Amino acid sequence: MNDTVKKPTGGRGDDPLPAGAALSAVAPHEPVSVVLAGGGTAGHVEPAMAVADALKALDPNVRITSLGTARGLETRLVPERGYDLELITPVPLPRKPTGDLARLPSRVWRAVRETRAVLHAVDADVVIGFGGYVALPAYLAARGVSPRKPRVPVVIHEANASAGLANRVGARTAQRVLSAVADCGLPGAEVVGVPVREAITSLDRAAVRAEARRHFGFADDARVLLVFGGSQGAASLNRAVSGAAAQLAAAGVSVLHAHGPKNTLDLREPQPGDPPYVAVPYLDRMDLAYAAADLVICRSGAMTVAEVSAVGLPAIYVPLPIGNGEQRLNALPVVNAGGGMVVADADLTPELVAREVAGLVGDPPRLAAMTTAAARVGHPDAARRVAQAALDIGRTARRARGATGGRP
């Protein structure tokens, strides 16, 4: 593995081939080459990195390349995890299909050419796509446009309860379509859950709780509320929870609040004897944050719901009030199972926070039941299942290419 970040090549990779050139004969026993297409937000990058780790666990010799753009979180997250990153041109995507693909912006086709060069350069056997503006060029490049140009098999993973444009396009020709939940809008999708990194899926909250609470400065017997709104925080969560600080303190609730690097909290001066209200811009150790908490207030992006349910943490989900309502849909399986509740963003007030949090943390049997229900909804083996599907397809593709002396 290496941590190289490579800039867009404009259609010619580090080992460029002329457009449509055939590859030389392929050795079928060489390591499988996997290209991960998931960039932009943490919701696309983190599942891709979880699958990358699972690929390495299943086959230490596998070759992994991530696709991304210079504007996405992948420029930091992928090298930090030790994987190679190839950058392509960022392209805007409409939220819904708008007609023939030929009418997509010219930048899409530039990104397709760049992606095709990457597939040639790394001798790709399979592409795993996670949706978003990095995945669409990968799906189109993997198809090829003539018998002389490469066709690379594709595995798609859809994390949201309602599939986006890129995955709807890619699913038409993908070899396998995997999803977080049933009825995501992709025909034939197999439910595997959302890939989550092993540090989270293997977390034993009870075993680590004392260490985690010491890490954040809480008493061993504290009742702890965790609050976070994604990598950039959430203003409405910040206002509602910080506004309830006095009532939470009176109820004996300690708070661990990640407010976002660009935000601040308007907190009152603590009174003598108040439980701690720990406010931080960002949480680098989410595993310890989950272990320290009894309850969480958070958004309901697919990755957030997957992690929170994987560790069995009761939650008050506050869906982001934009898009097609997919965040609310993401939360419904765990909520319907009894592992959490949904509060509309417009209804989230300091009074509601104080009332609901005090009621939940003051009712240990209810919290225990919610913990069990949340954990039952989680899919701790999702990353392994996605990785295994890709390896099976990639190995088959490599054997076929070895038998025919190149691309089929």
From Swiss-Prot:
Keywords: Cell cycle, Cell division, Cell membrane, Cell shape, Cell wall biogenesis/degradation, Glycosyltransferase, Membrane, Peptidoglycan synthesis, Transferase. It is a peripheral membrane protein. One of its GO terms (molecular function) is UDP-N-acetyl-D-glucosamine:N-acetylmuramoyl-L-alanyl-D-glutamyl-meso-2,6-diaminopimelyl-D-alanyl-D-alanine-diphosphoundecaprenol 4-beta-N-acetylglucosaminlytransferase activity. It holds the Pfam family Glyco_transf_28. Transmembrane segments: none annotated. One of its GO terms (biological process) is lipid glycosylation. Its main location: membrane. CDD domains: GT28_MurG. Its EC number is 2.4.1.227. It comes from the Bacteria. Residues 1-20 are annotated as: Disordered. One of its GO terms (cellular component) is plasma membrane. UDP-N-acetyl-alpha-D-glucosamine binds at T41, A42, G43, N160, R197, S231, Q327. It is found in: Cell membrane. Coiled coil: none annotated. It catalyses: di-trans,octa-cis-undecaprenyl diphospho-N-acetyl-alpha-D-muramoyl-L-alanyl-D-glutamyl-meso-2,6-diaminopimeloyl-D-alanyl-D-alanine + UDP-N-acetyl-alpha-D-glucosamine = di-trans,octa-cis-undecaprenyl diphospho-[N-acetyl-alpha-D-glucosaminyl-(1->4)]-N-acetyl-alpha-D-muramoyl-L-alanyl-D-glutamyl-meso-2,6-diaminopimeloyl-D-alanyl-D-alanine + UDP + H(+). Pathway: Cell wall biogenesis; peptidoglycan biosynthesis. Cell wall formation. Catalyzes the transfer of a GlcNAc subunit on undecaprenyl-pyrophosphoryl-MurNAc-pentapeptide (lipid intermediate I) to form undecaprenyl-pyrophosphoryl-MurNAc-(pentapeptide)GlcNAc (lipid intermediate II). NCBIfam families: murG. Belongs to the glycosyltransferase 28 family. MurG subfamily. This is UDP-N-acetylglucosamine--N-acetylmuramyl-(pentapeptide) pyrophosphoryl-undecaprenol N-acetylglucosamine transferase. It comes from Mycobacterium avium (strain 104).
